[in-house]
Amino acid sequence: MTTSKTNGPVVFKKNGEIAVLTINNPPVNTLAKEVRISLASYLESANQDADVLAIVICGSGRNLCGGADIREFNTPDREVQPMSRDLMNLLEESKKPIVAAIHGPTLGGGLELALGCHYRVADKLASIGLPEVQRGVIP
């Protein structure tokens, strides 16, 4: 059975035993407030669904996730729960395996998101990095 929720910054699709969460926040799929809220909600739903045996996180467009949304820096949206570290805890504590499908440039918080998953797969054009360390920011 296929179930889909196609509106919003994260698209949820359940195809049989696999839940696919697609970050859909153009142009680079940043971890903006709405994305964090939607990811957390869908992760919790998939973890509670007895029919779901595994979860895949991918990105629409050219990459998985470009990291934090710099437009939210120094704004109240930056502190809205769940914060990125809360998402990492949800990923790591999941009883179901979570796979990050990495493609394109996956940087900063996007790489941290992928590292929080149990498994990672990448296409041959994927690139990863933590550019914030060049500015003295510790991930």
PLM feature segments, named:
Residues 91-135:
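Glycine-rich beta-to-alpha active-site loop
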Residues 37, 51, 58-90, 106, ...:
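Glycine- (often His-adjacent) and acidic-residue-rich active-site loop
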Residues 27, 136-138:
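Small-residue-centered hinge/linker elements
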Residues 16, 59-61, 68, 124-126, ...:
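Short, small-residue-rich loop/turn micro-motifs
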Residues 21, 57, 69, 113-114:
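Hydrophobic/aromatic residues within transmembrane alpha-helices
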Residues 1-60, 75, 89:
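Conserved CoA-thioester-binding segment of acyl-CoA-metabolizing enzymes
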